[in-house]
Amino acid sequence: MSLKTRYRETIRPKLLKDLGLKNVHQVPKVQKVTLNRGLGEAATNSKALEASLKEMATISGQKALVTRAKKAIATFKIRQGMPIGCAVTLRGDRMYAFLERFINLALPRIRDFRGVSPKSFDGRGNYTIGVKEQLIFPEITFDKVDTIRGMDITIVTSASSDEQGKALLSEMGMPFRKK
């Protein structure tokens, strides 16, 4: 059963009851997942940006967007409009497919993994996790990687509080670390 189907058939009714909500539309849901990678070396090394764009597209199944500098910062040797990273925003079926792969395949492949931190919520039910290496994703092969780079993964939910967001992600199978 896919994560989307499981959400509709089992997770949503359970959360409706557990959180004491009156309406099915009040139940928190995942709105989007954003993958972001900042590349400081992209200003001088265009190959790093190309490789990163390819990796992000492989991981997400969607073309990555080049992020550019908003301002010129002399100490970092960047000018306004220079490419400094890449990002992908996933919604709908691709989002659920990515979340399922991330929770069930990628997270267990992290070295010394004991669960994700329950403190990474932003106060509005959204969760951000930093990944140190892209090799945890089964789509990436070690031979094709030039440099090990990390990325930030943000899961944006419609939850009004961190508790609701944590309840949603826990039901989806996110392995939170025990305190």
UniProtKB/Swiss-Prot annotation:
> What GO MF terms are annotated?
rRNA binding; structural constituent of ribosome; tRNA binding
The source's superkingdom equals Bacteria
Q: Which SUPFAM superfamilies match?
A: RL5-like (SSF55282)
Where is the chain membrane-spanning?
A: none
UniProt keywords (A-Z) are: Ribonucleoprotein, Ribosomal protein, RNA-binding, rRNA-binding, tRNA-binding
Q: Which Gene3D superfamilies match?
A: 3.30.1440.10
Can the keyword Ribonucleoprotein be found in this entry's annotation?
A: yes
Q: Which GO terms describe its cellular component?
A: ribonucleoprotein complex; ribosome
Gene Ontology biological process terms, A to Z: translation
Annotated family: Belongs to the universal ribosomal protein uL5 family.
Quote the function comment for this protein: This is one of the proteins that bind and probably mediate the attachment of the 5S RNA into the large ribosomal subunit, where it forms part of the central protuberance. In the 70S ribosome it contacts protein S13 of the 30S subunit (bridge B1b), connecting the 2 subunits; this bridge is implicated in subunit movement. Contacts the P site tRNA; the 5S rRNA and some of its associated proteins might help stabilize positioning of ribosome-bound tRNAs.
Q: Subunit details for this protein?
A: Part of the 50S ribosomal subunit; part of the 5S rRNA/L5/L18/L25 subcomplex. Contacts the 5S rRNA and the P site tRNA. Forms a bridge to the 30S subunit in the 70S ribosome.
What name has this protein been given in UniProt? Large ribosomal subunit protein uL5
Source organism? Prochlorococcus marinus (strain NATL2A)
Gene name on record? rplE
